[in-house]
């Protein structure tokens, strides 16, 4: 199985390296094209006003291409130009921090997988519910085995499998649950701070209100210790609103 591996935390991130080695141990051919620098929460951004430069990374049994660009840049450049062998699957992760609910709109990790799907490839995004993962070897091995079990040919066109791990060892996690994503939005605020020179700046903070999270959704199940899998599809159409608007305009 040929894999294009990318992420949004950067090519030297713990999660990407763990997933790389897990896939390699499973006998897969892994080609890495990932951002040189962290690109968290850049969404589906592409570089239009700056050139994309590429740097080769080789160390400690790892080899990959780092791109001075966004996660989506990496996937587009990799699939169209850089890869020697076309992949069977595009895999993005393992991200530091869960990607559930509205996170999927902000996430560079999910967007990279989505770009792979839009370009016609099966795709999976993988995240871990902690911003400070120390050891993700077992999660990497789990993903490698899961990739073999997913019926990719039977999934809908341009479907992304969004996988999230709870912040516990795999052996201590609750069973895998296939579920929908929560529709709860973040309640955001900005903390006003001051730098050493007396200049004001702002730092984003926020919470996802627990009381508004529906039972059985990704955030709910992940909090309860389950590994969650949510199939995503790029289609923002509000079909009910179509009928309402047609009636309003007499169409």
From Swiss-Prot:
The answer, when asked if Transmembrane is one of the entry's keywords, is no
Provide the coiled-coil residue spans: none
Question: Its catalytic activity?
Answer: a ribonucleoside 5'-phosphate + H2O = a ribonucleoside + phosphate
User: Mind listing the UniProt keywords for this protein, alphabetically?
Assistant: Cytoplasm, Hydrolase, Metal-binding, Nucleotide-binding
Cross-referenced Pfam families:
SurE
Q: Name one GO cellular component term.
A: cytoplasm
- Where it mainly occurs, coarsely classed, is cytoplasm
Source taxon at top rank = Bacteria
Q: What is its EC number?
A: 3.1.3.5
Q: How is the cofactor bound?
A: Binds 1 divalent metal cation per subunit.
Q: What does this protein do?
A: Nucleotidase that shows phosphatase activity on nucleoside 5'-monophosphates.
NCBIfam families assigned: PRK00346.1-4, surE
This protein's name: 5'-nucleotidase SurE
Organism of provenance: Maridesulfovibrio salexigens (strain ATCC 14822 / DSM 2638 / NCIMB 8403 / VKM B-1763)
- The gene for this chain is surE
